[in-house]
């Protein structure tokens, strides 16, 4: 019998609030100190796993109690995830580490409209969550024999450089005569789920910046990938880390002050080297280089799935992984073909992912313009989406399945989320099985829990694709081949 694990951690607020402190996230003004105290509701004698699949944290923010629900990001790594390092004499060393019992989580604050949290539980609690529209960070205080953590607003972190920063992609502003749909009205369904199998490469400047600590670099990349999953949920895109590479002995492509030249050189390297030994949909270079003209990153536009140009480059900020993830998401957005936001585009935050100017308060949201462009055009473009159908599928994602996480995994017919949130009458949220009499729970060929009739048009021809028709045997809309 499968036992449901409930972990509650009570965080008692320290008797005082600090005014200023130097943390891993940087210099922080105005923070709260809390002490995690873990209480586990496990049967007597049960073996507690190192990192639970689901956890709950209760603590106070500004004197108000909140409940943080966390669930392990089971799809963070693909099944054939690998790490490539290099020996001092330049020999390539590729390993396939066991990543099933990792410590990276997604979550939400109970009863808060913004379902956003990204947390590492590897050594204490480190990450961010959204509460009442504001971004809060939590991280351990490095005190001897202490479980103390700091909780603080993102806006209270002193920025290393307040000057405006730019995206290196130009002439891509949103322009449309069509009325902009609100995000809640977009026709994005689980049937349109896509997957980006991502390789992240840390260059030699990253290696020297982190004093050769490859473990710290890898942890930073895991945090970034975990954040990317939170960001791309709105597009029904799952980002799976399929490879990580670190360059300890020197740059393997030309990394210069010019973001354009660096991007071109990295693209050439992926063509002549990476593609021959590691399948992937997209590769991103994380660099310690500070580019000219305050450029934070660069990416080719509308090149996702391209044999050579499905790449991007992003400047690292050591203390701000969420900021780096925001910039990498921006570049991936351009790879997909998403334009910069115009003045009329909104996302309910101070800035959105595809804003042309980089905000010091990074967003986790795509604007209504981005969502509209993606759902109405990009998702149906065979050139920029053809590689995003092939997984990792439910048989490829590492870690045991968990019912209620919105992902249909091995042994499940459907997954509409927790019972309190499920709005799909075809799916039993408690068991992730179809309800009695139902043939399907979702898909373009699923109507009122039954398969659509064979031959029904489910997706019109577009570009090089033929019309797609229901088979009568599945709720999914099968892809027909390219036109001759």
Curated annotation (Swiss-Prot):
Chief place where the protein resides: secreted
Positions carrying Pyrrolidone carboxylic acid: 193
Tissues in which the UniProt entry reports expression: Expressed by the venom gland.
Cofactor(s) for this UniProt protein: Zn(2+)
Subcellular location as annotated: Secreted
A cellular-component GO term for this protein: plasma membrane
Post-translational modification summary for this protein: The N-terminus is blocked.
Glycosylated position list: 254
UniProt-annotated binding residues for Ca(2+) 1: 197, 281, 387, 390
UniProt keyword annotations, A-Z: Calcium, Cell adhesion impairing toxin, Disulfide bond, Glycoprotein, Hemostasis impairing toxin, Hydrolase, Metal-binding, Metalloprotease, Platelet aggregation inhibiting toxin, Protease, Pyrrolidone carboxylic acid, Secreted, Signal, Toxin, Zinc, Zymogen
Propeptide boundaries: 21-192
Cofactor note: Binds 1 zinc ion per subunit.
Record SUPFAM superfamilies: Blood coagulation inhibitor (disintegrin), Metalloproteases ('zincins'), catalytic domain
Family according to the record: Belongs to the venom metalloproteinase (M12B) family. P-II subfamily. P-IIb sub-subfamily.
Summary of the function given for this chain in its UniProt record: Snake venom zinc metalloproteinase that inhibits ADP-induced platelet aggregation in human platelet-rich plasma (IC(50) is 175 nM) and cleaves alpha-(FGA) and subsequently the beta-chain (FGG) of bovine fibrinogen, leaving the gamma-chain unaffected. It is also able to inhibit proliferatin of ECV304 cells by inducing apoptosis of these cells.
Record-given protein name: Zinc metalloproteinase-disintegrin stejnitin
Species whose genome carries this gene: Trimeresurus stejnegeri (Chinese green tree viper)
């Amino acid at each position: 019998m499968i036992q449901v694990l409930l972990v509650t951690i009570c965080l008692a607020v320290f008797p005082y609030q600090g005014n200023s402190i130097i943390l891993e996230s940087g210099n922080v003004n105005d923070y709260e100190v809390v002490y995690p105290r873990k209480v586990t509701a496990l049967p007597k004698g049960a073996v507690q796993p190192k990192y639970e699949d689901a956890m709950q944290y209760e603590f106070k923010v500004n004197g108000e109690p909140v409940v943080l629900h966390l669930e392990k990001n089971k799809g963070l790594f693909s099944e054939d995830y690998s790490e490539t390092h290099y020996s001092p004499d330049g020999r390539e060393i590729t390993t396939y580490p066991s990543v099933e019992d990792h410590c990276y989580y997604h979550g939400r604050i109970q009863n808060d409209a913004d379902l956003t949290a990204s947390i590492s539980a590897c050594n204490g609690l480190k990450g961010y969550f959204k509460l009442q529209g504001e971004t809060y960070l939590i991280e351990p205080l490095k005190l001897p024999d202490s479980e103390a953590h700091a909780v603080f607003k993102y806006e209270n972190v002193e920025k290393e450089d307040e000057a405006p920063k730019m995206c290196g992609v130009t002439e891509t502003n949103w322009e449309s005569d069509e009325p902009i749909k609100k995000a809640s009205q977009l026709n994005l369904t689980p049937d349109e789920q896509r997957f980006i199998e991502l390789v992240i490469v840390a260059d030699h400047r990253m290696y020297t910046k982190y004093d050769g600590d490859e473990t710290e670099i890898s942890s930073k990349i895991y945090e970034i990938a975990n954040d990317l999953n939170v960001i791309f949920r709105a597009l029904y895109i799952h980002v799976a880390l399929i490879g990580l590479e670190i360059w300890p002995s020197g740059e393997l492509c030309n990394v210069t002050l010019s973001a354009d030249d660096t991007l071109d050189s990295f693209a050439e390297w992926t063509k002549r080297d990476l593609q021959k030994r590691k399948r992937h949909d997209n590769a991103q270079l994380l660099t310690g280089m500070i580019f000219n003209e305050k450029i934070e990153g660069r990416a080719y536009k509308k090149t996702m799935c391209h044999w050579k140009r499905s790449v991007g480059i992003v400047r690292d900020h050591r203390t701000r992984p969420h900021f780096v993830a925001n910039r990498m998401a921006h570049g991936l957005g351009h790879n997909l073909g998403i334009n910069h936001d115009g003045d009329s585009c909104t996302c309910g935050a101070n800035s959105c992912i595809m804003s042309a100017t980089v905000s010091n308060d990074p967003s986790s949201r795509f604007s209504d313009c981005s969502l509209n462009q993606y759902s109405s055009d990009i998702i149906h473009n065979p050139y920029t989406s053809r590689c995003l159908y092939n997984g990792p599928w439910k048989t490829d994602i590492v870690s045991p399945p968990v019912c209620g996480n919105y992902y249909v995994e091995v042994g499940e017919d459907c997954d509409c989320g927790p019972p309190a949130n499920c709005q799909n009458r075809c799916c039993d949220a408690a068991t992730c099985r179809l309800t009695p009499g139902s043939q399907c729970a979702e898909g373009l060929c699923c109507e009122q829990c039954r398969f659509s009739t064979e031959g029904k048009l489910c997706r019109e021809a577009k570009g090089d694709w033929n019309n797609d028709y229901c088979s009568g045997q599945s709720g999914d809309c099968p892809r027909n081949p390219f036109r001759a």
